[in-house]
């Protein structure tokens, strides 16, 4: 209890080191939005020549109040309280509320898929926007091809170093982002003095007035560009477990002030230069003196790389959580760092690299990428709001307060979603298609698990204890292994999969000193590591339930070593003396793991939809990792056996013996 209380204190406590870590991990995406957000707003109005004072004030006001209502109110003040044992993100939120309604898995899948799709586009748009600052350096910039090649090289380097972990360069993230936000704040403050009337934008009147003003050429759809300023808000919630709530509470005011100052500085510059004709204007770089541009390009590129790294790492975490929640197939996961949160998934890394590079080559400029950027993340935010509503209900908040919060958020985010729909034909359809593909895989994987559970037959192990005891003493069979371990996906008290007992007794009688039946249960808590043992009133049958958090590695052999030691020390399991061993006094025998895989066979009587789901799953499994690596069995003795999933329509085919004499010449011989 004391350790839990101490952990709660550290989670809610803010430190100077935690402040820097938060800057480096949490705010990369939202912190780089000044690179391109104002550029998109100006372009939507038709360029600098078409800007009026009321438009500029209204646009900056929309930026300020979007950051306030969505990022500050929804995520910092409300969502950060919805932590699952100090972990945040849409899947952590889902595990908190999934018992309230079965259908809540739908917004969880949609939100997770769109967040992954957004994670592929963000590195492309942030790095490209930073490199495009070279347009102000004439002796460096030649054409857009230079920007594209430079961007592709940086992205290639970024994805190639993922296998080594981010801990080494990660130590620099915080200080670099502190410099970045300091630059945003100072430069924004200085440029605000170009026209101090920009401070009027704090008044929300200008934001509301712009939405209905005839001067606003984009009309309601300007919200599609405005939303770019808060696309990183979801990442803020997802990274809760990495930095703690206290550090976010302390660091967000600093970050928000710096970002708002940057937008105000850009707005003041626009006020001072409105009416001018400047091609391909990016206010972020336009406010800078010419001799500073190259240095700011370098700094902004570093900030963009850090933002991209945070999203890549976040994608790895998101996929690993989805796997443990049985929403995605198994992928090989490596842990290159020394901390629990550092992981690397080669398949996901390669997919992100290819997709991000495709976006750079397809869209070519940040201008075209921005058009496709915000739609997916608006969907994610709407799904998070749906889950958040049920969390507030679960916590017993007054219904009036819940209605006020939920309706308000749905109206605001729904407006951004509707405004972003126009971007569908401008390239957002690609991101939506990627999200739909991920949703399809999630649906197939989740549904197939439920179908398999329905068809797996169970037997009461108590009815077979005598046979197992007789087999272990039957010396007419060679000793298969001292310990035989079966991993089972379904184990309810004394009931286990029929296929397992068939494997032990029928397929090839497996004589062993001890039979282990292990079931891994993923808990709603992220870092649970517990087990429960039932010896079935014997000293040779061990039922083990492993309770592992959804962020824990499912490395069964390592946990079994601890369990065996505990059972022998408590006297529940006899010591297994080994006559031959390089380890003096070894008291534990050898182990063999048997993985029984159900294959779809004889499924003619299965409903067509279920057959389609299982056949699709089988095709997907061909390109995913095997259970052997997932459960950490690659260095153990393993046997993989295949059994048919459906046996209901297996019957003898009707055939009769021919009794009369047959002239064999009637049947022509076949060659």
Swiss-Prot record:
Transmembrane domains' residue ranges: 18-38, 60-80, 103-123, 149-169, 173-193, 218-238, 252-272, 292-312, 343-363, 373-393, 402-422, 424-444
Membrane topology, as annotated: Multi-pass membrane protein
GO MF assignments: potassium ion transmembrane transporter activity; symporter activity
Signal peptide start-end: none
GO CC entries: plasma membrane
InterPro entries according to UniProt: K+_transporter (IPR003855), K_trans_C (IPR053952), K_trans_N (IPR053951), Kup (IPR023051)
Record's catalysed reaction(s): K(+)(in) + H(+)(in) = K(+)(out) + H(+)(out)
Chief location bin: membrane
Keywords assigned: Cell membrane, Ion transport, Membrane, Potassium, Potassium transport, Symport, Transmembrane, Transmembrane helix, Transport
Entry keyword annotation includes Transmembrane: yes
Subcellular location: Cell membrane
Pfam families noted in UniProt: K_trans, K_trans_C
KW Transmembrane helix (keyword) present: yes
Cited function: Transport of potassium into the cell. Likely operates as a K(+):H(+) symporter.
Entry similarity comment: Belongs to the HAK/KUP transporter (TC 2.A.72) family.
PANTHER family cross-referenced by the UniProt entry: K+ POTASSIUM TRANSPORTER (PTHR30540:SF83), OSMOTIC STRESS POTASSIUM TRANSPORTER (PTHR30540)
Protein name: Probable potassium transport system protein Kup 2
């Amino acid at each position: 209890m004391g350790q839990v209380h101490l952990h709660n204190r550290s989670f809610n406590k803010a430190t100077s080191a935690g402040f820097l870590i938060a800057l480096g991990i949490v705010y990369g995406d939202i912190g780089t939005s000044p690179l391109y957000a104002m550029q998109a707003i100006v372009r939507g109005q038709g360029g600098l020549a078409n800007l009026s004072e009321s438009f500029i004030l209204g646009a900056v006001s929309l930026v300020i109040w979007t950051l306030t209502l969505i990022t500050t109110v929804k995520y910092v003040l409300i969502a950060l309280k919805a932590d699952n044992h100090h972990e945040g993100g849409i899947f952590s939120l889902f595990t908190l509320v999934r018992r309230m309604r079965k259908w809540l898995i739908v917004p969880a899948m949609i939100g997770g898929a769109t967040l992954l799709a957004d994670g592929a586009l963000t590195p492309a748009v942030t790095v490209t926007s930073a490199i495009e600052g070279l347009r102000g350096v004439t002796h460096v910039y030649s054409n857009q091809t230079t920007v594209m090649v430079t961007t592709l090289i940086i992205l290639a380097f970024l994805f190639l170093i993922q296998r080594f972990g981010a801990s080494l360069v990660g130590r620099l993230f915080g200080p670099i982002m502190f410099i970045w936000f300091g630059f945003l704040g100072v430069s924004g403050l200085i440029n605000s003095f170009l026209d101090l009337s920009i401070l009027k934008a704090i008044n929300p009147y200008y934001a509301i007035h712009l939405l209905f003003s005839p001067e606003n050429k984009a009309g309601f759809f300007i919200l599609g560009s405005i939303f770019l300023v808060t696309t990183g808000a979801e990442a803020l919630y997802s990274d809760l477990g990495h930095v703690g709530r206290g550090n976010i509470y302390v660091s967000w005011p600093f970050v928000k002030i710096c970002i708002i100052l940057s937008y105000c500085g850009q707005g003041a510059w626009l006020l001072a230069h409105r009416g001018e004709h400047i091609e391909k204007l990016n206010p972020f770089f336009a406010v800078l003196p010419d001799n500073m541009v190259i240095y700011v390009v370098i700094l902004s590129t570093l900030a963009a790389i850090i933002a991209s790294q945070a999203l890549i790492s976040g994608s790895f975490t998101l996929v690993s959580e989805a796997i443990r929640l049985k929403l995605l197939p198994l992928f090989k996961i490596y842990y290159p760092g020394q901390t629990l949160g550092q992981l690397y998934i080669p398949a996901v890394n390669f997919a992100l690299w290819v997709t991000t590079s495709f976006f750079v080559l397809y869209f070519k400029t940040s201008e075209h990428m921005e058009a496709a950027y915000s739609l997916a993340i608006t969907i994610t935010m709407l799904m998070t709001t749906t889950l958040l509503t049920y969390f507030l209900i679960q916590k017993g908040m007054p219904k009036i307060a819940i209605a006020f919060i939920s309706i308000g958020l749905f109206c605001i985010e729904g407006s951004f979603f509707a405004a972003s729909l126009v971007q569908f034909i401008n390239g957002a359809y690609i991101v939506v298609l990627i999200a739909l593909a991920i949703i399809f895989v999630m649906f197939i994987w989740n549904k197939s698990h439920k179908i398999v559970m329905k068809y797996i037959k169970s037997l009461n192990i108590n009815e077979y204890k005598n046979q197992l005891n007789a087999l272990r003493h039957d010396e007419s069979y060679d000793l298969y292994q001292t310990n035989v371990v079966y991993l089972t996906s379904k184990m309810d008290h004394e009931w286990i999969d029929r296929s397992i007992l068939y494997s032990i007794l029928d397929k090839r009688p497996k004589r062993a000193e001890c039979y282990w039946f292990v079931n891994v249960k993923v808990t709603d808590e992220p870092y649970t590591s517990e087990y429960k043992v039932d010896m079935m009133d014997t000293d040779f049958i061990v039922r083990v339930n492993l309770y592992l958090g959804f962020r824990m590695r499912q490395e069964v052999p390592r946990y079994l070593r601890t369990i065996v030691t505990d059972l022998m020390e408590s006297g529940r399991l006899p010591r297994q003396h080994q006559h031959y061993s390089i380890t003096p006094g070894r008291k534990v025998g050898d182990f063999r793991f048997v993985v029984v895989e159900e294959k779809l066979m004889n499924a003619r009587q299965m409903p067509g939809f279920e057959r389609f789901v299982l056949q699709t799953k089988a095709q997907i499994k061909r390109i995913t990792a095997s259970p052997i690596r997932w459960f950490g069995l690659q260095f153990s003795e393993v046997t993989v056996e295949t059994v048919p999933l459906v046996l209901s329509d297996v019957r003898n085919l009707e055939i009769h013996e021919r009794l009369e004499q047959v002239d064999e010449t009637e049947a022509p011989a076949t060659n």
